[in-house]
Structures are given as C-alpha cells and as structure tokens.
Amino acid sequence: DRSWFQHLKDELVGVIAENGYCKWKGIYPSRDVDTFHGVADTADGAEIRSITNANNCLIVRSDDPKERPYVLVLVDSNAICKMLGWIYGHEAMQDKWLRDPGGKRASWFVPQKSLRPIESLQADGRVANGTHPQH
C-alpha cells in the first residue's frame, strides 16, 4: 500500500503528464474529477499514463476502456514531459505482457519498444493512416 505522500506524488505526476501531453497536442485536458473511465483524460480521447523512471512500462488494467489510446509520458525531476509512445487498450491486453508484481491485481505491462510512435496519433484518436481500432 502507498503512503498518503506517495499517493499525492503519483497524482501530481499524473496531472503534470496530462497537462504536458495536452500542451504538446494543443488541446485541453479533461477537468472532470472522479469519473473513473467514464471520461477520457484528454479532449482527444486519450488516456495518459505517467512514469518517472525512464525504463518503466505503460500499464493497462482490466477495467480500462479497450478502445482508447493509452499514451506513455515520462515526467522528469524538473516536471519536463516527454511523449514516449502509445497503444490502444485492446492491443495492450496480450498474455505476454500480463503480470501481477504486487500480488493484488494483474495488469498488462507494455514495454516501451512495443509502443507506436507518438507522432502517429492524430488529434481525433485515429491512427495516422485513418484507421480506427479493431475490437
């Protein structure tokens, strides 16, 4: 279990990542609070996952919407954000990435090398060639 301080830090890093992504895209973040999957993190429908360790994976959980793109954002110690890549939720849910390191909740840990280039994500959430995710 996380301490209240670690929880606060994780929440702040998440907000920094969401705002960094939105600034990079030139869009607005969602300002909805406690919607838990009902509303995407950003106006273009993306879910933002933040890391502070450059070697960490993008994590997708079983209750995450499968049709949304998930973007991995690295937040450094100066609150500078780097967009690392993205993947659709349903693409992330592969057995080879399923792990349960804490013994509480299995999740998919997608390696950075398996993410799509960030430049291929358009403002409306479509892949650059115009296709939509397959379900």
Regions found by a protein language model. Give the residues of each.
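Nucleic-acid endonuclease domains
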Residues: D1-T42, R49-H135
